[in-house]
Design a protein with these regions (language model features):
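N-terminal presequence-like segments and the immediate start of the first folded domain
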Residues: 1-57, 61-74, 80-126
């Protein structure tokens, strides 16, 4: 089955050898996004809530390039430097997804330079 890779003029450019989004078999896989702007400047010095919104906005931009949104998410992976930020993240996250909520994993991670990274899998057939 063929794969299709997407690039976005709104999401940060990839910082390595990966695509912003890849579609295969009706699923769109979004690469992990962080609080970076289009010029790849990290904003890890901002409050967590600002970093979370910037990260989810970047993920939404990656979804949009495939003609979808985070409301099409069926799985989300969340990586937090500080697990105490989980409640604040969840409040913001609910603005971007819809019920039934996607399956989600939230793990503590030794992120460097920022407090959050989020990836997702979207279902086109929704």
């Amino acid at each position: 089955m063929p794969r299709k890779a997407y690039t976005s003029d709104r999401a940060p450019l990839p910082a390595g050898s990966y695509s912003v989004a890849v579609e295969a078999a009706g699923l769109v896989f979004l690469a992990g996004q962080t609080p970076r702007d289009r010029d790849n400047v990290r904003h890890g010095d901002k409050p967590f809530e600002v970093q979370a919104r910037m990260t989810l906005d970047n993920l939404e931009a990656a979804a949009n390039v495939a003609g979808l949104s985070l409301k099409h998410a069926v799985r989300v992976g969340v990586f937090l430097r500080n697990p105490a930020d989980a409640k604040a993240f969840d409040t913001i996250y609910r603005e971007y997804v819809r019920e039934p909520y996607p399956a989600r994993t939230l793990v503590q991670s030794s992120l460097v330079g920022f407090d959050i990274e989020v990836d997702a899998v979207l279902l086109r057939a929704d």
